[in-house]
Amino acid sequence: MELTARQKDILKAAIAIIANQGYEKLTTKNLATKIGVTEAALYRHFKNKRELVTMILGYFERISNDVLQEIRDGAYSPLESIRHFVEDRYILFSKYPDLAKVIFSEELFKNDPTFKGQFQCIMHKHKQAVENYILQAQQEGKIRNDLSPTQLFRIIVGSMRFTVTQWNLSDCAFDLKKEGSDLLETIMKLIETKQ
């Protein structure tokens, strides 16, 4: 489902509230105040808070699917695919730091098993894609084949998550794209075969 411009505005405002005040502060009153509409006007776009959070996760999933499709459509090597996926995440979160806070917030997912399941589905798609790039690179002799693709995925994406969290907690005190890119290159040097 394609979101209207107004729904995108509402989603961005909801993301900002969750990121800066917490999930409990995401109320129709606070959301309506933030975007300058009545509470009743919000219900034309979303039935309730659950639907709104589900749409936030759907929004993130669409963004993620877009980059995965871009990689599939491009002529990227497996190593370039890994780099493109990870660097795209750093660019996205640099542009939308509140989205990073929400997506990496365990508070959001412990409140509702539906949210947890939806986010696990998104993570599984990421895991499948990145592990596939790793496996292809191993088959091409570009990444050491004595390393587990699952463990490499956790190293690559786990370090990304830690870096984004560190960046958020420091109030964006460093260049996330540069630090992320430098970190990824360090990891790649460790896992790539010596040519």
Could you tell me what each predicted segment is?
Residues M1-A5, Q195:
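N-terminal intrinsically disordered/low-complexity leader segments
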Residues R6-D9, I17-E51, M55:
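Helix-turn-helix
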Residues A13-I17, L92, S159:
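Short amphipathic alpha-helical elements of helix-turn-helix/winged-helix folds
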Residues M55, E70-D98, P149-I156, K177:
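Hydrophobic alpha-helical connector segments
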Residues R62-N65, Q69, K95, P113-E140, ...:
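Amphipathic alpha-helical packing segments from all-alpha helical-bundle domains
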Residues S94-T114:
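Amphipathic alpha-helical segments used for helix-helix packing
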Residues A100-F104, Q138-E185, K194-Q195:
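Hydrophobic/aromatic-rich alpha-helical bundle segments in the mid-to-C-terminal region
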